Amino acid sequence: MPEVQPSALPKPAPRLGRDAAVASICGFVVALMVGASFAAVPFYDWFCRTTGFNGTTQVAGSAPSSEPLARKVSVRFDSNINGLPWKFEPEQREVEVAIGQVVTVYYSVTNTSKRATTGQAAYNVTPLTVGSYFTKINCFCFTEQTLAAGETREMPVVFYVDPAFAADNENDTVKNITLSYTFYPVREPPPKPLASGEPDQRKGNL
């Protein structure tokens, strides 16, 4: 049997090169996963708004072109606070509306603390299948709300239930709809500029 010369054997790849390649691949995969996670947030929000998935309501700039239908449903209003020193409640707990009828209701919110605070409302509709038909024309939930210490504000919600709701067989037994809001804190307001010569209370004694 002929003897294999050492020079004929395959040489192992340099370990340093292999480690660098593996590290590069791992870094690329991690970056891809992080990027995908950030992209998923706006995509999920867009998907919910477009389809009404998870009870997300729709947005319209005007009333429906068709006349309201004879069929009516009861719309209940729910309010919640998470992490804010606010009192938040609907001025009406329930209204009966015709399908396609534009309705305006009000929520009242009061900042019970001694400082300005900012919040924004998240919302959904139940049953979840109604989300794609529950349409808002105007809502305080579209923007952040900043309340001064002790301030009370009345905030309107203008909405209608799309007439297509009645054509969907899944809604044949739906008689009650609940619109729910939860206010969450957004950020601390920036400190007010001090007048000339006014001591800065945020600093300790020097």
UniProtKB/Swiss-Prot annotation:
- Listed GO molecular functions? copper ion binding
Signal sequence range: none
Q: Which cysteines are joined by disulfide bonds?
A: none
Q: What is its main location?
A: membrane
Question: Which Pfam family, any one, appears in the UniProt record?
Answer: CtaG_Cox11
Where does this one sit in the cell?
Cell inner membrane
Alphabetical UniProt keywords: Cell inner membrane, Cell membrane, Copper, Membrane, Signal-anchor, Transmembrane, Transmembrane helix
The residues exposed to the Periplasmic compartment are: 41-206
NCBIfam families of this UniProt entry? PRK05089.1
Q: What does this protein do?
A: Exerts its effect at some terminal stage of cytochrome c oxidase synthesis, probably by being involved in the insertion of the copper B into subunit I.
Q: What is this protein called?
A: Cytochrome c oxidase assembly protein CtaG
Q: Which organism is it from?
A: Rhodopseudomonas palustris (strain BisB5)
